[in-house]
């Protein structure tokens, strides 16, 4: 007879897998979230979403308020999720360089409208992108 696994147990097992994968969280597992650094909290937020096993992640401003070392850590994790775990990631990011380095396809918006679209690498080289970010 088939017995459906309890969702709480399944979520717990998934959380354990995520903790095993990210040493920074594993080492702080028994501490409250309020004592985590900004980067560790951002990783915890991403990890909480991963427990649900989504095929698509919507990520809003992952670098906002973080020190540069944590910005790099967050983008390394997103890159790993995209490449190793084949997750589709839709990202909104005001840090143009980081966002476009990460993007397969990027969109530069001005007043809510698409001003320029293209491959992330191409947009990084496009001088119009810099002008738009500087308000030109």
PLM feature spans:
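Conserved catalytic motifs of ABC-family nucleotide-binding domains
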Residues: 53
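Catalytic Walker B motif of ABC-type/P-loop ATPase nucleotide-binding domains
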Residues: 57-61
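Conserved ABC ATPase signature
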Residues: 32-36
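Helical segment within the ABC ATPase nucleotide-binding domain
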Residues: 72-86
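ABC ATPase C-loop
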Residues: 49-50
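Short, glycine/charged-rich "phosphate-handling" switch motifs in NTP-dependent
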Residues: 105, 117
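Hydrophobic anchor residue at the start of the ABC signature
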Residues: 46
